[in-house]
Amino acid sequence: PDLERKPYHQRYYLLYGYAEQPQDLHLQEALELLRQLGCDGGSLKQARDGQNVAELIEKSYVPNRQGVHYCDFCGVELTGAESEVLSDGRERCMNCSRTAVKTEAEFRKLYQDAARGMELFYGVRITVPVKIQMVNAKRLHRSLGKTFVPTAKPDGRTLGVAIKRGNDYSILLENGSPRMSSLMTLVHEMTHIWQYLNWDMDAIRRKYGAEMELEVYEGMAKWSEIQYAYLMGETAEAKRAEICTRVRQDEYGRGFVKYLTRYPMSYATHLEGATPFEDKETPL
C-alpha cells in the first residue's frame, strides 16, 4: 500500500483540495455565528471545563491555613484590598458584596429559581406552600439556639433554617447574603422540607440510629446544595464548599462524606449518576 503522506492541502478538508481556503467560504464568520448561538458550549466541553476547574481547585485550595483569611460566604482566600469586615465580624469578598440579596422580593424570586432548578436537576417538587422570611442574623441564630463567633478561617455560619410546625413550612434566610450563597442555602433548606414530606422519619431513625440521624439529614442537604452549584456551572464556589465541608468534624461534614461515597459529585452541568432523592427508604 502507498504509505506516502499526502500534501497538507489534500489532507485539510476545509481547503477542499485547493492550496488555499476558497474565498466563497466565510469560515471565521461561521465560527463566530456558532459561538453566538452557544454551539461551542456542548455538554462534553462543559464536562471537561468543569472537571478541569474542579481539579485545579482541588490541588491548590487549602482551607484553614494559618494566617490566611477567607470569605465567610464563598470561601475564597482574601486580600486586604478585596474584602470587608461586617458588623458581626464576618469577612466578605467584594464579589459577594456586589451580589448581596437585600429585599424579600429578590428572595422570593430566588426561591422560585431554586424550585425550578430542583425539579429540573433532581426531578423533585416541593408540593406545599413555603413561607420565605428574611431575618437578621440575631433572629436567625436565636431560632437555631446558636451563637456565632467569627474567625479567620471560612466560618460555615448557618444562613438559613427550615421550620416545620404541623402542616406549615417556612424558611428563614439571613438578609444581606450573596446571591449564590443564598441560592445554595435555599436548596439546602428545601431539601429538608422535601425530606419532611417524603421520608418516614421514624423509619429513618430506626434504620440509622439516633446517633447518625442528623448525618443522614444534613449530609444529604449539603450534598444537594453543592451538587446544585456544580450543575449551575458555579464550579469554583462548589469545589471550595465541597473541600470545606469534607474537613468539617460535625454532622454536616461526616454526613456529606458518607453521601459522597455512594453519590459521587458530577462536575458537569448535568448529572452523571444517581441522587439520594431516588431512594426514599435507604438514602444513605
Region locations from a protein language model:
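Long, well-structured alpha-helical subdomains associated
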Residues: 231-284
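Active-site recognition of the HExxH zinc-binding catalytic motif
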Residues: 118, 184-197, 218, 222
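Hydrophobic (often cysteine-bearing) scaffold residues that line and stabilize catalytic clefts
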Residues: 107-110, 183, 187, 213, ...
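Short pre-active-site segment immediately N-terminal to the catalytic Zn-binding motif
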Residues: 170-186
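Post-HExxH zinc-binding segment in Zn-dependent metallohydrolases
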Residues: 207-244
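Sec-exported extracytoplasmic/periplasmic mature domains
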Residues: 119, 123, 195, 199, ...
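Auxiliary, metal-adjacent structural segments of Zn-dependent hydrolase domains
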Residues: 103-166
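N-terminal low-structure segments adjacent to metalloprotease catalytic domains
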Residues: 1-18, 26-112, 116, 120
